[in-house]
């Protein structure tokens, strides 16, 4: 199967392709859920009254098939075919196999660049939330331990010598405070990930009348990237 960027009458040596691809398909499967979620928002925007680049009938047809793919992803039965370039190509391939030319319309007004970026942003946002929840749970545990063991004494060392009395509670509390600082870093990372890159195209925007505010709201982003070049950085 020809790759998305493969030039006519040219092919890549199988060993080179295997080396460069590596474990990409495995990592791409992690993005599959978010790729479909991003596409659902994209086609809804394309069919909106402010854009009208997709008919309501085509939007409903695409949405139905995308949701079927989403069910397969969540069931763990979705896979990327051998020779398929990436998860984005796999999803489009399934749509065009089922819907013909209608399936190809999903790529209107969207570059592979901003499609990949929105997948990554959605993935990072979800994982940061998971980690933040785990950090919060561990913080609560350490604080309880700190309070429970505040009177359980241990020697405090400096320069390998006993210096002052300390306690298990003090040390549990120290690690709890470290987690507070980690949570602040996670919050900052979440804010950076919580910006919508859709509509930035390949880094220079789009000539289509895309509604970036709409996809921002549909995907739960705080705001779109203001500068389309920065969205790609």
Regions found by a protein language model. Give the residues of each.
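A helix-coil-helix interface module used to build multimeric assemblies
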Residues: 1-205, 209-218, 222-224
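Amphipathic, heptad-repeat alpha-helical segments used for oligomerization and assembly
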Residues: 225-233
């Amino acid at each position: 199967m020809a790759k998305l960027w493969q030039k006519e009458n040219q092919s890549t040596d199988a060993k080179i392709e295997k080396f460069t691809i590596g474990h990409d398909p495995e990592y791409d499967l992690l993005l599959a859920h978010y790729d479909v979620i991003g596409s659902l928002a994209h086609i809804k925007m394309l069919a909106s009254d402010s854009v009208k680049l997709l008919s309501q009938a085509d939007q409903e047809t695409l949405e139905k098939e995308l949701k079927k793919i989403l069910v397969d992803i969540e069931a763990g039965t979705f896979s990327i075919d051998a020779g398929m370039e990436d998860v984005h190509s796999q999803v489009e391939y399934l749509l065009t196999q089922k819907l013909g030319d209608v399936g190809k319309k999903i790529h209107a007004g969207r570059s592979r660049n901003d499609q990949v970026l929105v997948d990554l942003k959605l993935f990072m946002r979800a994982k940061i939330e998971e980690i933040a929840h785990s950090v919060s749970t561990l913080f609560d545990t350490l604080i309880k331990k700190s309070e429970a063991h505040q009177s359980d004494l241990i020697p405090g060392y400096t320069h390998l010598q006993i210096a002052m009395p300390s306690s298990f509670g003090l040390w549990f509390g120290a690690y709890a405070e470290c987690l507070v600082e980690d949570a602040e870093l996670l919050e900052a990372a979440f804010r950076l990930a919580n910006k919508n890159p859709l509509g930035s195209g390949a880094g220079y925007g789009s000539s289509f009348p895309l509604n970036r505010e709409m996809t921002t709201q549909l995907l739960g982003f705080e705001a779109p990237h203001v500068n389309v070049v920065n969205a790609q950085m």
